[in-house]
Amino acid sequence: MAISKVYARSVYDSRGNPTVEVEVTTENGTFRSIVPSGASTGVHEALELRDGDKSKWLGKGVTKAVSNVNDIIAPALLSANVDVKDQKAVDALMLTLDGTPNKSKLGANAILGVSMAVAKAAAAEKKVPLYQHLADLAGSSTTPFVLPVPFLNVLNGGSHAGGALALQEFMIAPTGAESFSEALRMGSEVYHNLKSLTKKRYGASAGNVGDEGGVAPNIQTAEEALDLIVDAIKAAGYEGKIDIALDCASSEFFKDGKYDLDFKNPESDSSKWLSGQELADLYKKLVEKYPIVSIEDPFAEDDWEAWSHFYKNAGVQIVADDLTVTNPTRIATAIQKKAADALLLKVNQIGSLTESIQAAKDSFDATWGVMVSHRSGETEDTFIADLVVGLRTGQIKTGAPARSERLAKLNQLLRIEEELGSKAIYAGKKFHNANKL
């Protein structure tokens, strides 16, 4: 079935910044998607087109991206009469219209909005849930479907928070749960225990939450943060059932070839900055002491040597985000250099659904894991919840069990699990190889 209308408008994300919403209309109705945006963005990412007019929205307007959908993409899609179910053809047409390697002409935010809305329209035409349509597009096995382990960002540092803590995200992963719904209950209980402990130790205001719903107390070191989380896990009664994951976002504190764990202090002492090897030693100590199962972006996005050296004997999942930015060329290099063994999949880093699916497949082919991810500037759109089930990746990170833009995805996964019943299993401790379950 052909598309009868494509329309974009500017709406707001969870940080109050403008973002692009796209509606695609077919005979079956109108289908809508909203594009997220990140705070710590990799230099190799597809371009999110912002207006740059400082007199409106502090330069963050998306009126150009919206116009690109309404004035360029919409007429081209309608005149090409592309079948809404032919995702590859839709995406290829937009990439040709754009013609740049990083989508800088039309904007990844314009292209992705259309790409996701088209997938929703196609699922409706096929009369199947979105996750089933995405599984069809990816060629994923659906016997059984796999529900992901939620990696819940319960404590924030780095660029997402004040305080001196350099590492950006401390996540809990309820790998010992029997189902997704049990995992979310466990995660929620630990989160509440963590908030109480944080207020007791750091004062009432320390319980306030950051962009992704995690607490952001004035913590100085990773050990202090991890001790607090371990205490919360114990208080909730889930020791041994809940693991921990880190997103270090190290590109944010990489300076002159060294890592500055005091990067938020303008007078930071450069004699205390760490080499890649010294930072690797710090991670190894943390892995030995705490139940850490996954480390994302342990080193800067172009510090390939440090990545490859660390991966050899890390013993935990090493997730590439800024290193690969969901970009097929960067993923191929990371695979060849043996720099990591999991991809963080953010659809807006590459900017189209077809390319996102290909990135996941390339990763699976190299026996990598894939973790589907939200962005810090999120919306009520639940697309990635269906995507993680459709791609069968077994792991998702979408913030804390707090703030509606985070819960939207987690609640959608609860619905999917309920709908699938015995046709689905929970990834649990096998999250890294969920595509093979």
Curated annotation (Swiss-Prot):
One of its GO terms (cellular component) is phosphopyruvate hydratase complex. Its EC number is 4.2.1.11. Keywords: Cytoplasm, Glycolysis, Lyase, Magnesium, Metal-binding. One of its GO terms (molecular function) is magnesium ion binding. Transmembrane segments: none annotated. The active site is at E212, K346. It comes from the Eukaryota. It is found in: Cytoplasm. InterPro entries: Enolase (IPR000941), Enolase-like_C_sf (IPR036849), Enolase-like_N (IPR029017), Enolase_C (IPR020810), Enolase_CS (IPR020809), Enolase_N (IPR020811). It catalyses: (2R)-2-phosphoglycerate = phosphoenolpyruvate + H2O. Its cofactor is Mg(2+). CDD domains: enolase. Pathway: Carbohydrate degradation; glycolysis; pyruvate from D-glyceraldehyde 3-phosphate: step 4/5. Belongs to the enolase family. Homodimer. This is Enolase. The lineage of its organism: Eukaryota, Fungi, Dikarya, Ascomycota, Saccharomycotina.
